[in-house]
């Protein structure tokens, strides 16, 4: 009986010691630089086309296929996190702030740039779902970070300089029973300094900057009911534009800048009551609404004046009297509207 137990114990120890354990080791660097040092990039775009995604024509990024060595069935995925402040979004992807004028779009993921995940927010997120190496094989797990600058705001020098800046981190995520133990799991990234040389295109106004439209004299009987309209005057605006510029415009009520309706406020010099002014463009049947005095892309009540294929765009404007429904008292009618062009 004693000999039987000795044989059994010896076999058990032999089987135990041949069990394989999934393995991982860190072979990369904990601190990594993204992009070439002192990179310089040049682009041309319409002045107010902001935020402008600055295609640098080549990748600003970091790739390394050999960050962790894995073997014996080890399963690994990747998580990524950006530490820069979120200052906006573009098509659902966060724009991260570098300076007041320059931001970044960031992708993190596996070794191939094409598989990178568009980053949003400042929390850890899955950027590579993962895989498991074969039980009897060995391989490596890599990673990549890619960025694209975004111009957020114009400056007078048309030159934007960015200093070396910490971006965030990627960490290895073991799963399916795999464990990293004491192995380094997190690597950090910093963006190398770079310069953007920005050339902007725009338009020149050919029409005088101050246009006076003489309004025709009418009788109250021509506006019998609330909402009735009569053409009061007309004018045109003409511009000369660089190629590729799409012109947008915003009308602002100079007397009441907060006005967002389609009826222009009469100035204090007006003596008529119960009548307002509407402005139409070209052959439109809907009057233009008033918005803030701003060239910002997407400004409230901004409307398109031309396409990027027109280098000599123009617009015909019609001013119409409108019965506001408050009872018309004859008198003088004066209104002031400003135009703000946005070159996109």
UniProtKB/Swiss-Prot annotation:
It is found in: Fimbrium. Residues 1-22 form the signal peptide. InterPro entries: Adhesion_dom_fimbrial, Adhesion_dom_fimbrial_sf, Adhesion_dom_sf, Bact_Fimbrial_Adh_Pro, Fimbrial_adhesin_lectin_dom. The keyword Ligase does not apply. It comes from the Bacteria. Pfam families: Fim-adh_lectin, Fimbrial. Residues 288-308 are annotated as: Disordered. Its main location: other. A carbohydrate binds at residues 65-66, 110-111, 139-142. Residues 23-199 are annotated as: Receptor-binding lectin domain. Residues 200-344 are annotated as: Fimbrillin-binding domain. Residues 299-308 have a biased composition (Polar residues). GO terms for molecular function: carbohydrate binding. Disulfide bonds join 75-132. One of its GO terms (biological process) is cell adhesion involved in single-species biofilm formation. Keywords: Disulfide bond, Fimbrium, Lectin, Signal, Virulence. One of its GO terms (cellular component) is pilus. SUPFAM superfamilies: Bacterial adhesins. The keyword Disulfide bond applies. Essential fimbrial adhesion factor that mediates binding to N-acetylglucosamine-containing receptors in the host intestinal microvilli, leading to colonization of the intestinal tissue, and diarrhea or septicemia. Also confers adhesiveness to laminin and basement membranes. Belongs to the fimbrial protein family. This is F17a-G fimbrial adhesin. It comes from Escherichia coli. The gene is f17aG.
């Amino acid at each position: 009986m004693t000999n039987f137990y000795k044989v059994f114990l010896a076999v058990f120890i032999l089987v135990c010691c041949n069990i394989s354990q999934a393995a991982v080791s860190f072979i990369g660097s904990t601190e990594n630089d993204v992009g070439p040092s002192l990179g310089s990039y040049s682009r041309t775009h319409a002045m107010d086309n902001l935020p402008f995604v600055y295609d640098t024509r080549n990748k600003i990024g970091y790739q390394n296929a050999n960050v962790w060595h894995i073997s014996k069935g080890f399963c690994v995925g990747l998580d990524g996190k950006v530490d820069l402040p979120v200052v906006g979004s573009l098509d659902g992807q966060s724009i991260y702030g570098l300076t007041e004028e320059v931001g970044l779009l960031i992708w993190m993921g596996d070794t191939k740039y094409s598989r990178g995940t568009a980053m949003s927010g400042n929390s850890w997120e899955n950027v590579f779902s993962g895989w498991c190496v074969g039980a009897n094989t060995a391989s490596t797990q890599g990673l990549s970070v890619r960025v694209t600058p975004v111009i957020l705001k114009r400056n007078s020098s048309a030159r934007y300089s960015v200093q070396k800046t910490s971006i965030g981190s990627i960490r290895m995520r073991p799963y399916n029973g795999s464990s990293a133990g004491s192995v380094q799991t997190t690597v950090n990234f910093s963006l190398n300094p770079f310069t953007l040389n920005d050339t902007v295109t725009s338009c020149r106004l050919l029409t005088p900057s101050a246009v006076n439209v003489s309004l025709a004299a009418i009788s109250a009987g021509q506006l019998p009911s609330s909402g009735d309209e009569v053409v009061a005057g007309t004018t045109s605006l003409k511009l000369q534009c660089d190629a590729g510029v799409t012109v947008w415009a915003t009308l602002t009520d100079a007397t009441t800048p907060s006005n967002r309706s389609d009826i222009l406020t009469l100035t204090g010099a007006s003596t008529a009551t119960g009548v307002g002014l509407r402005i139409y463009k070209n052959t439109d049947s809907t009057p233009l609404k008033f918005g803030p005095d701003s060239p910002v892309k997407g400004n409230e009540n901004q409307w398109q004046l031309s396409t990027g294929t027109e280098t000599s765009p123009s617009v015909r404007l019609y001013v119409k009297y409108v019965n506001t429904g408050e009872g018309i008292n004859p008198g003088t009618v004066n209104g002031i509207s400003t135009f703000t062009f946005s070159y996109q």
